[in-house]
């Protein structure tokens, strides 16, 4: 721990934890923690409600129930007496009670001294019994190891074990004695002992007599038992008094026989760890040699070696951690602090208690009873029973759920919650209280749309704001002397006195709030807004941010949180503000895109109509034109001319006079910044080729003729508007850090404020760049505007005399410029939103039954289909086709007919462009052709809720997931009763699938976050030269491109110099591939494969470097150090998971390979690295070579033999394939290891076995990308790479060499590389290991951090293994720091660079060094 002293005169210290380690608690540790022994099972006195002395709530042990009050005499002390002892009465002097606050009851522990050692439940129950693995017990004369069950029988006193044989051949060491074999074992042992004594010696004669008597008793017992065929359980268990015979044997020989925890204690104490370690190493060595010699590896030897590896790992854990195995026994049981297991008083004198108290009570009662039996020399059988009961009661306290089949239950027959249950699961300590905490200063309400809000604003109901900002409002009310005290101010707020509202409005200025909508699937589900007070009780949300939140206004609720500290407020403003989060992190495309009504309005606004009212008119300015439009002299869609100089600062030929466009497009273009090109049509990309010159006309042109001959352009649809938004973002998003703007603001004064362009231009690296010039102009304009505003305000305050600026005013100016500069894109979107809403209202779009135009050809096509089906039925009846064939043919025929109807409707849409419904469809506002076909054509085939079974997929059966008879009516015609019923299956299935998918998707995201949570960008360059060669990802079966090369390289760095096909150098290593450069590489230079830096080859441990990661998609700039890319990756893959369909995604037909390639199920198979994926598995080639022939097998009639001629060796290799499998290869095809011979999913472990890690990585990347792209979801490669890297980040040690590893251990790949690097540098033999693949379920459990692993799943197992190896958690990841309440080591708490997005200094900090001016009034002048 690091001790950080706060303040000079304070004598207290705050501790900051550097690392945390877990070890076995010894008896001494427990006594050191304890403040006293609990000896009574009582809790509180039921009359006085005071804790009982020496009970489970004793104030002397656990601390007082009232602050600073003596628990014995009740005297109250002051806070300054804390830590002293009370000496008020004789008893106080004797007991010396400490004076403490009552909060100490949450930390002070006690203990119970057990009168016999107890085996800790976890160590013989969790992970197949640690004790069993450690001891590896077997009888001396047998090779069979005792199972976990046999060790448990010993612990629970149902068997005895020979711990020392004392030289007796009949009692081999470690023989386990049960009641059914006891008589024989004891008889043989007693006879062997008797034979060692000589009758002729008088002293020994007595011994022989005693042994003989015991033997006679044994024989009688044996006969009695065998004569009773159905002897009762009692007699079977207790027929033989083990203790009597054990005593005789121990007395007359050196043998020792023990049972229960005493036996386990003896075995653990006398267990030689180092000797056993050597023995196991030798055995493993011998096994390895045997396995190498064998041509066919025997599975039993591999299994035996696996077991030995596990034993060795446990023995090594104890040796390396320097702990004693007997620490797994409990002699002093810790009692957790009283307030962590509270006793709550209910009305009517009843109490509700925590289950743990009940479990402790059982232990204390049994322990006290055992002491009584022991002191009164009770029969051994009674003591044994009591010992067993204590063992069971301690087990129940530790882990009651695992005590199957009979956990301890309460009066209501509910299993009691033990300590383990309080840790594990969703409601356990880790997930409920450490990783997720309740947050103060929060509220929630229904959301409604706020179309008049700015992008960075949210409407907060004023009653809510009054409560959320209560402390600040109270301060304001007291300062303004409206309320004299805190209490009275609170009263005003609670009563909602009208006097408070102006102050509430003043308080919330500059205090952002966070809005969150559950489920929080990605980081854009929490964003910051500036609060605006509204009346009413619903939160008003900006319509454009709904996509990011996945919200709609049908009753969704959102939560509001208030950032309190200055740092959190700055973070909210700089990083979380909605106007900064324009791009979605998963694909780098704008997530804030206009949609629905706005799109419809813009589509209407930008229409062009030939011969519209006022066409070819000329106006002197935009204002004149707008006035004419307002007074209805010209139509919105008319094409008119305006002098080009009044519209945009065009740099065109001097003879150009007019600019031609529609009134609507002139209005639309006003929404964009002044120096943004004018958008004439949807060929905006071609403006570089002067495509727009046809709209720029020289003086003297006859406008009416010229305009008549111009082609009519289509209005702008959703895709085009999204493209414009993207271009605005690329051109205008902030390119200059605040520190550089501050350097200009420092120099600005009333003499130079109107001309700062050059000051700003000098700050850009590339001054000549168009973008740099544009940004310098923008910043200069903002500087001028804001300077004038502030200067005017200061001059007014100063009675007309100009004032000298101080740091406060400069920081205000900087804040204003910085906000405006970063708000350009958002302000454009806001203007677009206003136009969209306004013109969608003006367009008067309606939706009526008359608008639904239908096709006359429909009946003809339906008749065709019916005739075809009749023919099919006849063929089926005559036996020409099977039922399955009839079904598949019928389905495909109806699909074709629906396609024909769709095409005929498309023609009608083309001819009726004015139609409201078609406008909605074509603009992209709502609906698509398939919706319209159901409305006006025919509904077509309906889905049927059929479960596809694994057997169906493996045998390629036809699964009837579609109803054979289609719905022939459209909604316009109306459905018949049968058709309505037929369509209900699919509708219900759709709803259930969505519900199931949402839950699975949430769980997937959680697992992915756990896999990648500690991956943060942590350095500039890791120096790796291990790149990834990328080309188009293609589907080899259908030869379609899944992800084009241009998308894969854009935003990544090159791993090696790039040359054109002619050998010309295009770029050096580590060059960032921009969008333009990527376009040139693919389209200009026609390069098919590029080697890029990849996360899969990054050498940064517990993170990635900037070069291997590339561009940050959410900001379209190189990634910053401190970015938590692991979590962003997990969210980007998990968030669209809900959109992936379930497994039953197919249009009826064979449940084969086709339908299993898609859907959520397949994604889970890949990410969890399933051993047996769904369906028929692919057979893969194991060799490089060429397919030489494919022939029928001579031995099996249903098999084919695929022969492969191996390269280099010229040997023929054969693969046996089932005849009913679809072959992927033909004769002459080249194959390499991992190539598919038959269709189907590849088993990842098999692929890894025959190829290498890189092949598996590429296969996973391709498969996961295919799943998402099939559903139209684009996710960047780099996110999938992060998850894949984690899945292949462990190495299984095969040959340890001179390393610290041992064979069979699984180590982190970085650890493996570091250790081997060290060994090679010292000239020693390096370790050899194989990369293994672990799915998302196992990956987090192998984490270096036991806190992160334990909080994921299998908590008990993780904690047990961490304790025996004294594991240290270095707190490097995010999760473990959250658990400890630290700031997470990413973002603003990381080692970020200066001027990066995480460098969120307060604007005031840039002017702190300026000398402070004191202003004096002197002869009506201000002097400093």
From Swiss-Prot:
Q: Which reaction does it catalyse?
A: RNA(n) + a ribonucleoside 5'-triphosphate = RNA(n+1) + diphosphate
GO MF entries: DNA binding; DNA-directed RNA polymerase activity; magnesium ion binding; zinc ion binding
SMART domains associated with the record: RPOLA_N (SM00663)
Establish whether keyword Magnesium is in the entry: yes
- Cofactor(s) the protein requires to work: Mg(2+); Zn(2+)
What is the name of the gene encoding this protein? rpoC
Q: Which residues bind Zn(2+)?
A: 1022, 1098, 1105, 1108
According to UniProt, the name of this protein is DNA-directed RNA polymerase subunit beta'
Any one Gene Ontology biological process term?
DNA-templated transcription
Q: Which family does it belong to?
A: Belongs to the RNA polymerase beta' chain family.
The cofactor binding remark recorded in the entry reads: Binds 1 Mg(2+) ion per subunit. Binds 1 Zn(2+) ion per subunit; 2 are expected compared to other organisms.
* HAMAP family per record: RNApol_bact_RpoC
Q: Does the keyword Lyase apply?
A: no
Q: Which InterPro entries match?
A: DNA-dir_RpoC_beta_prime, DNA-dir_RpoC_beta_prime_bact, RNA_pol_asu, RNA_pol_N, RNA_pol_Rpb1_1, RNA_pol_Rpb1_3, RNA_pol_Rpb1_3_sf, RNA_pol_Rpb1_4
Q: Which GO terms describe its cellular component?
A: DNA-directed RNA polymerase complex
Its EC number(s)? 2.7.7.6
**What is the documented function of this protein?**
DNA-dependent RNA polymerase catalyzes the transcription of DNA into RNA using the four ribonucleoside triphosphates as substrates.
Any idea which positions bind Mg(2+)?
Answer: 552, 554, 556
User: Subunit arrangement?
Assistant: The RNAP catalytic core consists of 2 alpha, 1 beta, 1 beta' and 1 omega subunit. When a sigma factor is associated with the core the holoenzyme is formed, which can initiate transcription.
Arranged from A to Z, the UniProt key words for this protein are:
DNA-directed RNA polymerase, Magnesium, Metal-binding, Nucleotidyltransferase, Transcription, Transferase, Zinc
């Amino acid at each position: 721990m690091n001790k950080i002293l706060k303040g000079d005169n304070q004598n207290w210290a705050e501790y900051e934890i550097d690392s945390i380690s877990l070890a076995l608690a010894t008896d001494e540790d427990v006594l050191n923690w304890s403040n006293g022994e609990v000896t009574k099972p009582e809790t509180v006195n039921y009359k006085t409600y005071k804790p009982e002395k020496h009970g489970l709530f004793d104030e002397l042990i656990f601390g007082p129930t009232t602050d600073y009050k003596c628990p014995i005499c009740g005297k109250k002390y002051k806070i300054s007496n804390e830590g002293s002892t009370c000496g008020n009465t004789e008893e106080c002097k004797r007991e010396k009670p400490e004076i403490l606050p009552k909060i100490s009851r949450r930390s002070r522990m006690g203990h119970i001294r057990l009168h016999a050692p107890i085996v800790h439940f976890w160590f013989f129950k969790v992970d197949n019994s640690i004790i069993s693995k450690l001891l590896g017990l077997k009888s001396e004369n047998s090779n069979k190891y005792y199972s976990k069950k046999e060790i448990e029988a010993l612990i629970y006193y149902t068997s005895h074990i020979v711990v020392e044989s004392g030289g007796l051949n009949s009692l081999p060491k470690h023989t386990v004695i049960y009641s059914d074999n006891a008589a024989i074992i004891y008889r043989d042992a007693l006879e062997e002992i008797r034979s060692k004594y000589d009758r002729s010696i008088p002293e020994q004669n007595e011994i022989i007599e005693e042994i003989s008597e015991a033997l006679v008793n044994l024989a009688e017992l044996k006969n009695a038992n065998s004569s009773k065929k159905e002897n009762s359980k009692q007699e079977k268990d207790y027929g033989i008094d083990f203790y009597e015979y054990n005593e005789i044997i121990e007395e007359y020989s050196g043998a020792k026989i023990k049972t229960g925890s005493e036996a386990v204690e003896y075995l653990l104490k006398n267990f030689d760890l180092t000797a056993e370690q050597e023995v196991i190493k030798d055995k493993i060595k011998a096994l390895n040699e045997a396995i190498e010699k064998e041509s066919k590896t025997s599975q039993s030897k591999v299994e035996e070696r696996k077991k030995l590896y596990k034993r060795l790992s446990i023995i090594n854990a104890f040796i390396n951690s320097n702990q004693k195995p007997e620490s797994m026994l409990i002699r002093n049981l810790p009692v957790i602090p009283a307030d962590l297991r509270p006793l709550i008083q209910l009305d009517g004198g009843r109490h509700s208690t925590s289950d743990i108290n009940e479990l402790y009570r059982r232990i204390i009662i049994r322990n006290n009873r055992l002491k009584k039996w022991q002191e009164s020399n009770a029969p051994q059988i009674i003591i044994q029973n009591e010992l067993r009961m204590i063992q069971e009661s301690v087990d129940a306290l530790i882990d009651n759920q695992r005590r199957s089949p009979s956990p301890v239950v309460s009066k209501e027959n509910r299993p009691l919650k033990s300590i383990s249950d309080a840790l594990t699961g969703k409601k356990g300590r880790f997930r409920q209280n450490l990783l997720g905490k309740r947050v103060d200063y929060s509220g929630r309400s229904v959301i409604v749309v706020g179309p008049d809000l700015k992008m960075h604003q949210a409407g907060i109901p004023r009653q809510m704001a009054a409560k959320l900002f209560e402390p600040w409002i109270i301060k304001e009310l007291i300062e303004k002397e409206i309320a004299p005290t805190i209490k009275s101010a609170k009263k005003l707020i609670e009563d909602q006195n009208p006097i408070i509202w102006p102050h509430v409005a003043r308080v919330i200025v500059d205090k952002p709030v966070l809005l969150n909508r559950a489920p929080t699937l990605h980081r854009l589900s929490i964003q910051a807004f500036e609060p605006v007070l509204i009346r009413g009780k619903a939160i008003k949300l900006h319509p454009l941010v709904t996509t990011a939140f996945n919200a709609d206004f049908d009753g969704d609720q959102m939560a509001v949180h208030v950032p309190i500290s200055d740092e959190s407020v700055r973070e909210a403003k700089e990083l979380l503000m909605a106007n900064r989060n324009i791009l979605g992190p998963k694909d780098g495309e704008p997530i804030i895109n206009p949609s629905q009504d706005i799109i419809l309005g813009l589509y209407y606004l930008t229409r062009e109509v030939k011969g519209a009212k006022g066409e070819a008119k000329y106006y002197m300015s935009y204002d004149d034109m707008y006035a004419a439009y307002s007074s209805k002299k010209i139509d919105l869609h008319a094409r008119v001319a305006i002098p080009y100089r009044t519209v945009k600062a065009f740099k065109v030929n001097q003879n150009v006079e007019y600019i031609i466009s529609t009134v609507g497009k002139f209005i639309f273009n006003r929404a964009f910044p002044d120096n943004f090109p004018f958008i004439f049509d949807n060929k905006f990309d071609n403006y570089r080729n002067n495509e727009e010159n046809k709209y720029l006309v020289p003086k003297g042109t006859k406008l009416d003729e010229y305009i008549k001959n111009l082609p009519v352009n289509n209005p702008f649809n959703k895709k085009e508007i999204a493209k414009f938004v993207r271009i605005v973002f690329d051109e205008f998003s902030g390119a200059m850090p605040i520190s550089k703007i501050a350097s200009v603001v420092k120099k600005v004064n009333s003499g130079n404020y109107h001309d700062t362009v050059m000051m700003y231009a000098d700050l850009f690296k590339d001054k000549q760049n168009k973008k740099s010039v544009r940004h310098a102009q923008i910043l200069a304009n903002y500087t001028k505007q804001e300077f004038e505003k502030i200067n005017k305000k200061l001059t007014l305050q100063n009675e007309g005399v100009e004032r000298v600026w101080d740091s406060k005013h400069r920081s205000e100016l900087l804040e204003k410029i910085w906000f405006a500069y970063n708000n350009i894109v958002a302000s454009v979107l806001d203007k677009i939103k206003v136009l969209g809403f306004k013109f969608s209202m003006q367009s008067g779009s309606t939706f009526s039954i008359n608008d639904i135009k239908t096709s006359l050809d429909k009946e003809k096509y339906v008749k065709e289909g019916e005739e075809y089906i009749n023919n099919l039925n006849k063929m089926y009846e005559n036996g020409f086709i099977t039922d399955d064939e009839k079904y598949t043919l019928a389905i495909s025929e109806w699909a074709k007919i629906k396609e024909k109807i769709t095409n005929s409707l498309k023609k009608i849409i083309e001819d009726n462009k004015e139609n409201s419904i078609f406008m909605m469809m074509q603009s992209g506002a709502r609906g698509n052709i398939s919706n319209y076909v159901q409305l006006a054509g025919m509904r077509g085939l309906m889905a049927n809720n059929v479960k596809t079974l694994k057997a169906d997929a493996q045998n390629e059966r036809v699964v009837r997931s579609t109803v054979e008879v289609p719905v022939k009516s459209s909604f316009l015609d109306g459905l018949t009763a049968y058709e309505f019923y037929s369509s209900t299956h699919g509708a219900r299935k759709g709803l259930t699938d969505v519900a199931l998918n949402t839950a699975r998707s949430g769980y997937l995201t959680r697992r992915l976050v756990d896999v990648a949570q500690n991956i943060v960008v942590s350095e500039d360059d890791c120096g790796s030269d291990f790149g990834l060669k990328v080309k188009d990802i293609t589907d080899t079966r259908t030869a379609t491109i899944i992800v084009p090369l241009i998308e894969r390289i854009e935003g990544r760095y090159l791993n090696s110099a790039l040359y054109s096909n002619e050998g010309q150098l295009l770029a050096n290593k580590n060059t960032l591939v921009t969008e333009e450069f990527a376009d040139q590489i693919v389209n200009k230079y026609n390069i098919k494969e590029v080697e890029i830096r990849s996360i899969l080859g990054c050498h940064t441990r517990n993170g990635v470097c900037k070069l291997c990661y590339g561009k940050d998609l959410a900001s379209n700039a190189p990634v910053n150090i401190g970015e938590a890319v692991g979590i962003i990756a997990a969210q980007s893959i998990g968030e669209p998971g809900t959109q992936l369909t379930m497994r039953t995604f197919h249009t009826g037909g064979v449940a084969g390979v086709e339908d299993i390639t898609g859907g959520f199920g397949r994604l889970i198979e890949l990410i969890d690295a399933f051993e047996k994926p769904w369906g028929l598995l692919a057979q893969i080639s194991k060799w490089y070579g060429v397919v030489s022939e494919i022939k029928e097998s001579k031995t099996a009639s249903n098999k084919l033999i695929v022969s492969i001629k191996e390269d280099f060796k010229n040997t023929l290799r054969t693969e046996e394939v089932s005849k009913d499998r679809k072959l992927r290869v033909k004769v002459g095809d080249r194959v390499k290891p991992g190539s598919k011979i038959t269709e189907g999913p590849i088993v990842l472990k098999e692929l890894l076995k025959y190829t290498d890690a890189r092949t598996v990585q590429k296969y996973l990347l391709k498969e996961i990308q295919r799943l998402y792209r099939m559903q139209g979801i684009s996710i960047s490669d780099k996110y999938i790479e992060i998850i894949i890297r984690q899945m292949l980040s462990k190495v299984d040690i095969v040959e340890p060499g001179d390393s610290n590893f041992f064979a069979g251990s699984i180590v982190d790949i970085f650890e493996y590389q570091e250790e081997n690097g060290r060994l090679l540098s010292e000239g020693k033999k390096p370790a050899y290991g194989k990369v293994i693949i672990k799915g998302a379920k196992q990956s987090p459990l192998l984490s270096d951090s036991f806190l992160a692993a334990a909080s994921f799943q299998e908590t008990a197992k993780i904690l047990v293994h961490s304790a025996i190896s004294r594991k240290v958690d270095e707190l490097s990841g995010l999760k473990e720091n959250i658990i400890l309440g630290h700031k997470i080591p990413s973002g603003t708490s990381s080692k970020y660079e200066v001027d990066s997005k995480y460098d969120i200094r307060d604007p005031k900090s840039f002017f702190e060094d300026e000398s402070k001016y004191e202003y004096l009034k002197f002869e009506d002048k201000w002097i400093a």
